């Protein structure tokens, strides 16, 4: 076992997570169509503060993330502070770590708490795949800058005359990695082939995810942690996630064609997480501050770890790399965990990470460790379903996972939970949570 790194303040306080909330998650261009991420962020933070009954002035910092950036609101965190009635003096800044963005936001607030610069803060993220920054071609962008500097009408007309019809076409946001040109689905296909993961295995995991998420809603387990969203023109509220298939059937999965490798692929729209809109946030504070306010924490942040690997081959292995570090820093092993919640970007990616966590060879050759991190116990794994069912508003997923895991730990009488995710750019994140 390597070095244990206790997450405590100088006074010995643990980092408490006292509350968490999210909007329902909605598939792209459905319930939240036309609502930008900043408004989703305001919605969830405003409701989180109202439910917690914590005075706004208690919150000294807000760290928030957004992956699909909107040029008109580059600092989503500050806009949320200004748009929710929080104290205008509340420090606020934005972060981005692709699909692990709200993991990063939580880590940043935790670091401020440990440094003693704040005693309470909010971390979270929001994304909209329905309100996108549609750009212009590079040639048109350059001409527009030059036109703005031109002094005469003839100079402006001369500049515009250089453009062709194709230069005027809108440019949608990139869906591929900047450095490689590979889409996330292409990487998932790589991983399915590298680790021998079949179409049947992927469909089975997706089916399991939907079944468990549907059951979680049916049992009322998510009601406390998901707000009702009132959407303009306010005719009908959104109460639950709208991607979950309550009637999920393996036979239906088998009918779908591959989405990326059309000829030989196994990754489909059904065994991948969909483009989604939503927001999620958590309130963190020092343990002593929570006691002062009479709050009973949901749980505590025991450890966290971030990792990075090469992007050209099988880059969505973040959980396999970051989990052993987070466990080591928490002074725990896989067998000590009560729950394991892994982000399901794709069924292929999820199954590959499960395989490598139990691989002695991967531990030796890739991680330089003597033994495998540990087998993943199916009875502890994604017990309420995962991102394939709930959806994945990129910056909000980590906060969803943290809140969901802490609530489930409390229902089970406490214990330790691991939340972990892969992210674009070959990044990985893992956090160990504790509930009493």
UniProtKB/Swiss-Prot annotation:
- Cellular compartment(s): Cytoplasm
Q: GO molecular function of the protein, one example?
A: enoyl-CoA hydratase activity
UniProt key word Transferase: yes
Top-rank EC class of the record's enzyme: transferase
Record GO cellular component, one term: cytosol
Q: Which UniProt keywords apply?
A: Acyltransferase, Cytoplasm, Fatty acid metabolism, Lipid degradation, Lipid metabolism, Transferase
Q: What is its EC number?
A: 2.3.1.16
Q: Which reaction does it catalyse?
A: an acyl-CoA + acetyl-CoA = a 3-oxoacyl-CoA + CoA
Pathways involved: Lipid metabolism; fatty acid beta-oxidation
Q: What is its main location?
A: cytoplasm
Checking SUPFAM superfamilies in the record gives: Thiolase-like
Q: Where is the active site?
A: 99 (acyl-thioester intermediate), 392 (proton acceptor), 422 (proton acceptor)
Keyword Transferase (UniProt): yes
Give induction info. Answer: Unlike the aerobic pathway, the anaerobic pathway is not strongly repressed by FadR regulatory protein.
GO biological process terms, semicolon-separated: fatty acid beta-oxidation; fatty acid beta-oxidation, unsaturated, even number
Matching entries from PANTHER family are given as: ACETYL-COA ACETYLTRANSFERASE, CYTOSOLIC (PTHR18919:SF107), ACETYL-COA C-ACYLTRANSFERASE (PTHR18919)
- Subunit comment: Heterotetramer of two alpha chains (FadJ) and two beta chains (FadI).
Role summary: Catalyzes the final step of fatty acid oxidation in which acetyl-CoA is released and the CoA ester of a fatty acid two carbons shorter is formed. Strongly involved in the anaerobic degradation of long and medium-chain fatty acids in the presence of nitrate and weakly involved in the aerobic degradation of long-chain fatty acids.
The text of the family note is: Belongs to the thiolase-like superfamily. Thiolase family.
Supply the name of the protein: 3-ketoacyl-CoA thiolase FadI
Q: Gene name on record?
A: fadI
